[in-house]
Swiss-Prot record:
Species the sequence originates in: Bordetella pertussis (strain Tohama I / ATCC BAA-589 / NCTC 13251)
Family annotation (PANTHER family): ENGB-TYPE G DOMAIN-CONTAINING PROTEIN (PTHR11649:SF13), MSS1/TRME-RELATED GTP-BINDING PROTEIN (PTHR11649)
Nucleotide-binding listed as a keyword: yes
Name of the molecule in the record: Probable GTP-binding protein EngB
Cellular component aspect of the GO annotation: cytosol
Chain ranges of the EngB-type G domain: 23-203
Family: Belongs to the TRAFAC class TrmE-Era-EngA-EngB-Septin-like GTPase superfamily. EngB GTPase family.
GO BP annotations listed: division septum assembly
Role according to the record: Necessary for normal cell division and for the maintenance of normal septation.
Gene: engB
Amino acid sequence: MSLLHRASFYISAARLDQLPPAGAPEVCFVGRSNAGKSSAINVLCNQRRLAFSSKTPGRTRLINMFGLPDPLAPGEQLGFLVDLPGYGYASVAHREKEKWADILGGYLRDRASLAGIVLLIDIRRGVTDLDRRLTNFIAPTGRPVLALLTKADKLPYGQRMRTVFAVRKDLADIGALHMVPFSSTERIGLEEAGAHIENWISPKVVP
């Protein structure tokens, strides 16, 4: 069984100071509203309703943590998946956008247990201005980044690969960057992305 398939809900937090103390490795998921973040978490964890997306894009305001139980230490967590609020939806008030920017920036900058960042980008849109703003938070952290180019099934293979090269160029400021075309519905890139995330949590995954 994949390590990620053991994931279960751990805690929700509206503010950074409500998170548990930094400890076990954390992998966070960040992306523009409607980039397919919740769907990606669910398919990676082989669960239909682990992560929820709001019916109104941009309204998911909580940080949601999902624990990955340590099979050798009952009650302990081997690591966490952290679902950060989606950012940048046009209908959200400016004050709310600033609040989200503070949460995203604060978590990425200060969370000592952050082991890796999963950045979700809609492959049909490419890197938007909002994505570039987010890279301003990501690049200085020096953390490794897995860019999932979501909804890859919507593009033919040739166009898909051209977009990969274009996005790589746009994200050149991020040093340790790995890119995977990804589709939650067609399961494109699922195995590669899952293995990458598992390696951040535990280089030696217990079967």
